[in-house]
Amino acid sequence: MQCIKCIEINLLQKKLGYFFHTVDLLLRALTHRSFSNKHNERLEFLGDSILNYSITNILYHRYNHMDEGDMSRIRSSLVCSRTLVELAKEFKLGNCLKLGQGELKNKGYNRESILADTVEAIIGGIFLDSNIKTIEMLIAFWYQFRLNKIDLEDKQKDPKTRLQEYLQHHHLPLPIYCINQVQGQAHDQIFIMNCQVSSLKYSVMGRGSSRRKAEQDAAENALKFLIEINND
């Protein structure tokens, strides 16, 4: 039977900067559906909404010069799976996950989707264990370095946005994205997307664990080719 040692729970709570009054909430947040029907998906749903609200509130009050478009774009970069996975690794969440045998064999403790979902579940758990003010302060603490690095220039924009703006600037048609291939089993798929740009002879491919990530990767690759060809 899989168990989580008290020392691991204490280390995790130290990294979070929060000690649960009801530790069962933390244990539930760490429980994947493959381990038990008392899993973390409801907490994840709650945490997702709280994270979006908290980041929005922080941006609104911290950057009063920021317009709606910039806030939306930067919020997206702060709450995306990639950033949540970074947080999960900082917390060393993989050491504490409660996974079924199948997920353990497939190294589920390294799967980005599981790590990102667990961070959201922990946020939901802390909210239920305390209040909105406490979790918002914690989120601000976790994101402090990232918030300090916020730059409203192009490097904060996602690759698809940057590619679109590049093409518009050069008076070229917008790109077309289409699925090339889907590899792997349903629980661990890799999407391969084509990005078609009129000024490139061939479609440019991108890979990712979701269609959106694959499109972003393809856009990034297409933009690199265009910049290299045009010496921009």
Swiss-Prot record:
Active site: D48, E120
Cofactor(s) of this protein: Mg(2+)
Cellular component, GO, one term: cytoplasm
Subunit field text: Homodimer.
Pfam family membership, one: dsrm
Compartments (UniProt record): Cytoplasm
Family: Belongs to the ribonuclease III family.
Protein name: Ribonuclease 3
NCBIfam families associated with the record: RNaseIII
Residue ranges of domain RNase III in the record: 9-131
Record keyword Ligase present: no
GO molecular-function term, one example from the UniProt record: metal ion binding
Residues that, per the record, bind Mg(2+): E44, D117, E120
Biological processes, Gene Ontology terms: mRNA processing; regulation of gene expression; rRNA processing; tRNA processing
InterPro entries: dsRBD_dom (IPR014720), RNase_III (IPR011907), RNase_III_dom (IPR000999), RNase_III_sf (IPR036389)
Domain DRBM: 158-228
EC number: 3.1.26.3
The organism's place on the tree of life at top rank: Bacteria
Assigned keywords, A-Z: Cytoplasm, Endonuclease, Hydrolase, Magnesium, Metal-binding, mRNA processing, Nuclease, RNA-binding, rRNA processing, rRNA-binding, tRNA processing
PANTHER family noted in UniProt: RIBONUCLEASE 3, RIBONUCLEASE III
Reactions catalysed according to its record: Endonucleolytic cleavage to 5'-phosphomonoester
Reported function: Digests double-stranded RNA. Involved in the processing of primary rRNA transcript to yield the immediate precursors to the large and small rRNAs (23S and 16S). Processes some mRNAs, and tRNAs when they are encoded in the rRNA operon. Processes pre-crRNA and tracrRNA of type II CRISPR loci if present in the organism.
